[in-house]
């Protein structure tokens, strides 16, 4: 439609996904371009040109957006190659014109925390890491993240940014499927090469005047992330990294970072030291729980529930390396859990590989409820908490397009909304440390769950409440998380790492994902506004439901 508005004579568009193709035809008609734009309901690589083809003649301008986080991961090379071979005249204009992938070697112990499990220390080493894991290069997949949100003091560039791959989309140079580049460059600083930051940019025009840039020093509002490739220790080569230690396959990078969180580990260790004695017999119900080894090091006998095969293999390595095979028994199935008479303490971080939003880790509560409530437990309480926020960018993933560049796209909004209402959960998981937001209210409790008592499967919980809005702004979301109370003094949170102050930016835990409710209708709020909410919990199946509504008081 932009091309039609600029005066193009003939325009052919293609869309293979039937619901979107149908919607596109409707939008083209509603904006008055049905006589100028022909939509072909197939992939561009399936289109043919000729008398009985999809196009009567070749085009002289190509406009396409087939890029992803790694630039060419969505079939960009084959798409452009086919277009030049079949759909375009020679010397056609291609938008974008060129693409460049950049890389920069950096030193960062924070980034390294996402890649390799480190020993747990408390003055001395409590849990050592197997050499296989220490030497492993990690997963082959890059780690997508918003590098603009990584604090500048947490990494040191060791080399200048380098263009490693250049792609000429214009057709003047061939696009190769297999390409390898070796670069020789001088370091700008001494240090340990922990990782490679990678990003890309696009030259949109033939004169290289219009640049679409994804550069990590500039906060990006686009839906692309920069990404990280982590370097194998003390090895310089061009081989594809492959995990051979099980840990990188079993656990996400977020979980690996969580296992390396020193502050978090110290709180657990302090709480466990007060609770565990050499006579303790503990059941640990958490996937990939290194703290189970800490409990064993404190002298207790441990039953460790590990239902996931990959996680179980990883934990077996840790148990063997730390010489704890005589104190830790790994249990593969819930059916094989020890009898109540065999244990006197149940522990969980809690964390489960299958959990997406934080409260799904309440599976710990359900597992402990198989035992009498007289058996001591940790944590003792779970508090689901929330705060009203103004996101800087995250709300755009749910925001309607409305009118964009002068075109009415409301039909697309309706299609997406109907689909979203059928398939999307009103609360989704997001790593909020990557998405800036300011607090519009104080943090508030939704529900406190006493984990020392067994689940009452017959009790339906429904709670309502209101909280005041304490700062003016645009309330476009609610952030939700869980605080786990370990004992009367110590707790760990999967939410903010600092006290929430209304009107100030919230600092979130970088090693967990929080729950987010994004409003479909965004409200401008003042200190006269309130947030009303309701929460429903069905213990029979573990289902929870959140509802939020902004009330504006004149």
Report the location of each language-model feature:
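Class I SAM-binding transferase module
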Residues: 1-554
């Amino acid at each position: 439609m932009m091309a039609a508005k600029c005066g193009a004579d003939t325009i052919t568009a293609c869309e293979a996904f039937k619901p979107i193709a149908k919607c596109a035809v409707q939008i083209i008609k509603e904006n008055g371009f049905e006589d100028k734009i022909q939509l072909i309901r197939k992939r561009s690589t399936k289109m043919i040109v000729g008398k009985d083809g999809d196009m009567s003649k070749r085009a002289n301008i190509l406009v396409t957006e087939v890029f992803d986080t790694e630039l060419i991961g969505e079939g960009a090379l084959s798409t452009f190659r086919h277009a030049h071979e079949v759909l375009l005249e020679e010397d056609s204009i291609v938008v974008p014109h060129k693409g460049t992938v950049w890389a920069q070697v950096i030193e960062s112990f924070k980034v390294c925390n996402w890649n390799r499990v480190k020993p747990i220390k408390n003055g001395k080493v409590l849990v050592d890491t197997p050499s296989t894991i220490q030497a492993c290069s990690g997963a082959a997949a890059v780690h997508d993240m918003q590098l603009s949100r990584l604090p500048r003091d947490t990494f040191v560039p060791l080399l200048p940014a380098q263009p490693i791959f250049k792609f000429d989309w214009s057709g003047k140079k061939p696009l190769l499927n297999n390409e390898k580049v070796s670069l020789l460059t001088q370091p700008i600083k001494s240090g340990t090469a922990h990782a490679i930051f990678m990003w890309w940019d696009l030259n949109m025009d033939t004169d290289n005047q219009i640049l679409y840039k994804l550069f990590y020093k500039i906060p990006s509002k686009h839906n692309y992330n920069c990404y990280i490739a982590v370097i194998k220790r003390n090895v310089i080569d061009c081989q594809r990294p492959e995990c051979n230690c099980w840990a990188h396959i079993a656990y996400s990078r977020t979980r690996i970072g969580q296992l390396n969180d020193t502050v978090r580990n110290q709180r657990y260790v302090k709480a466990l030291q007060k609770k565990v004695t050499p006579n303790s017999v503990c059941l640990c119900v958490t996937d990939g729980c290194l703290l189970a080894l800490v409990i064993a090091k404190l002298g207790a006998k441990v039953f460790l529930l590990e239902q996931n095969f990959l996680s179980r293999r990883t934990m077996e390595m840790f148990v063997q390396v730390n010489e704890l095979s005589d104190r830790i028994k790994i249990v593969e199935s819930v059916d094989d859990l020890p009898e109540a008479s065999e244990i006197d303490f149940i522990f969980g971080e809690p964390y489960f590989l299958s959990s997406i939003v934080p409260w799904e880790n309440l599976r710990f509560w359900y597992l402990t409820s198989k035992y009498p409530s007289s058996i001591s437990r940790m944590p003792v309480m779970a508090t689901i908490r929330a705060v009203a926020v103004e996101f800087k960018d995250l709300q755009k993933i749910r925001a309607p397009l409305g009118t964009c560049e002068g075109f009415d796209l409301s039909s697309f909004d309706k299609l997406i909304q109907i689909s979203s209402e059928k398939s999307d959960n009103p609360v989704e998981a997001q790593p909020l440390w990557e998405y800036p937001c300011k607090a519009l209210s104080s943090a508030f409790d939704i529900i406190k769950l006493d984990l020392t008592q067994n689940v009452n499967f017959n009790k339906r919980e429904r709670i309502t409440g209101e909280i005041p809005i304490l700062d003016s702004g645009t309330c476009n979301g609610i952030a939700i998380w869980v605080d786990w109370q370990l004992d009367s003094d110590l707790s760990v949170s999967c939410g903010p790492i600092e006290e929430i102050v209304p009107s100030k930016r919230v600092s979130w835990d970088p090693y967990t994902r929080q729950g987010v409710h994004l409003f479909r209708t965004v409200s401008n709020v003042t200190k006269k506004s309130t947030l009303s909410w309701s929460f429903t919990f069905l213990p029979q199946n573990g289902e929870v439901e959140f509802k939020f509504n902004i009330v504006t008081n004149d």
